[in-house]
């Protein structure tokens, strides 16, 4: 009875994982898998801490993540996100806090260094490349 119970439990867990996440997670890219898992795990009224969630994502997928976060915020989810992504920092209604090693203070999106540097680079990439 012992091995049959263990085998049955493992088969049940495998079936539940397949139902929730799909039969072949390797069929998706790393970023697609990340977004899929995130969508499956987020529950209404949850509090979530995300550390650089943009890391496995292309810019287009970062926009998809932004939409997921916006939709979940409408379901009363709260997010604390450590990010370098100007795209994620642009989430409507986000409170951006700057941690400088000594203090934590609110900062306007347009004043965030990553936003200013990205904007300046996109406005004139040749100027930046000459200074490298």
Where do the model's predicted regions map?
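Conserved D-loop beta-strand region of ABC ATPase nucleotide-binding domains
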Residues: 51, 81-82
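Conserved P-loop NTPase mechanochemical-coupling segment
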Residues: 2-28
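A short beta-strand-to-loop transition that corresponds to the Sensor-1 phosphate-sensing loop
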Residues: 30, 83-85
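Short loop immediately C-terminal to the Walker-B catalytic DE motif
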Residues: 54-55
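Residue-level preference for the first positions of well-ordered beta-strands
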Residues: 47, 78-80
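C-terminal lobe/lid and adjacent interdomain/linker elements of RecA-like ASCE P-loop ATPase modules
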Residues: 60-78, 85-132
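GG-anchored amphipathic helix commonly corresponding to the ABC/SMC/Rad50 NBD signature/C-loop
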Residues: 20, 28-50, 60-72
